[in-house]
Amino acid sequence: MKTFEQFGIKIPKILLPKKLDTETWATVACDQYTQDREYWKKAEECAKSKPSTLNLILPEVYLNDKDKNEKILKIRKTMQTYLKEGIFEPEKEEFIYIERTTSHGRTRKGLIVAIDLEKYEWKPFSTALIRATEATIVERIPPRMEIRDGAPLELPHIMLLVNDPEKLLVEESGILAKKQNEQLYSGKLMLGGGSIKGWEVSTQEEMDRIEKSLEKLSAQNTCSDGSVFLFAVGDGNHSLATAKSVWEKYKTEHPESANDVENPVRYALVEIVNIYDEGLTFEPIHRVLFNIDSKELIKDLCTKLEGTTEKINTQKELEESVKNSSSDFGFTFMENGKQSFVLLKTDIKELAVSRLQPALDDFLKTAPKSHICDEKGCRLIKAEIDYIHGSDEIFRLGKQENTTGILLPPVAKDSFFATISARGPLPRKSFSMGEADEKRFYLECRKLFS
């Protein structure tokens, strides 16, 4: 079987259940609906008394519960039970091409592979083949290590992005797979998750074609320093950083395995998606600041971002101006009892958020406390920031006193890789790849710790 070591990829040995009912077996990524226990209760009802990946994961809504450790032990036992009781078909060495249609009518294409954690680095200014897209919060790794370290099975919700405008890797794999291979699964996903189909990718012809596409993509994504930036982590940054940390810990405890290219702990199962896939939406995550002087903020950002400001008459006009730009920002706030709209125009060439967030962080460090008087009395309160999905919510918040909503421009796919290559991982909450119910669902499994 062909190897793809130089591209940081390995053909995984994939496990699929014998009687695959996608609607009860597959579960949405554990880092979704973190404030919505009701969603996970509904998921439990959907999967009740049936084999399900829900029994193999710990939704992050429960990460701080007192019985977390008991839940992790139960997950391990369930994994062992599924392996012993013949829930799975025999493992098969293959890639899988998938098509995911969401409830929003979008179809996203993906390729399931294993990646070599030796070729991945989450730390800033990495020159690794596989790099993080957003700043990794180190404190989030240890609790996730407790779940992965020693687990008999791995389930992927990580999505890697490939910079492939010619659609050579994922899309071409799909054309060939659908033409000549059996369909592995097809069905609905629970709770409005849409539907999913998967095809085997394993013939020599397919492997040869994938190798050629990776060679071309490597050449096209070679940076000025000579490093190759082949894949960016789109979803699951902290999960992949956790997998890397577990592998580093394992090497320390088992130094004889440090160079073992067959050790399953060295790899992570992921889905590769083309950043240019029309079914993959990139939405900006907007900002809102509380308890600050809006005019002082705009003046400060205008200086730091070397821009110019323009008064805008209506909400619609401001929204359209920002939406049709890649580097302009919209502000909405109350002034003399009326809602005001201001456009900040800049000539930023990289992704706009990579310049805005550091400037906001600087402003918040020095922003004076606001003097507020209400029925509770008078007091000083400090400035705060929050991250908002959707422009409607920004304009609603902009109607509140002492509040400034900031609209961010669309995330430009064509400058995404270049920005990360030049500036390192993006600031926190930079972009969102679709809605919560569009995130990857757990479906395929792989043996991890024996």
Model-based region annotation:
Residues M1-G193, G198-S202, E215-N221, V228, ...:
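N-terminal extension/subdomain marker
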Residues V61-L63, P165, H238, W247, ...:
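Short, glycine-/Ser/Thr-/acidic-enriched flexible segments
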Residues L161, V233-G234, E271, L407-P409:
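Short beta-strand segments
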Residues R209-H254:
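Active-site beta-strand/loop microenvironment that shapes enzyme catalytic pockets
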Residues D235-T303:
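Catalytic or ion-translocation cores adjacent to nucleophile or general acid/base/metal-coordination motifs
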Residues I272-V342:
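C-terminal amphipathic alpha-helical segment
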Residues D347-E350:
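Non-catalytic terminal and connector segments of soluble metabolic enzymes
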Residues A352-S450:
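Charged substrate- and nucleic-acid-binding regions of tRNA-handling and nucleotidyl-transfer enzymes
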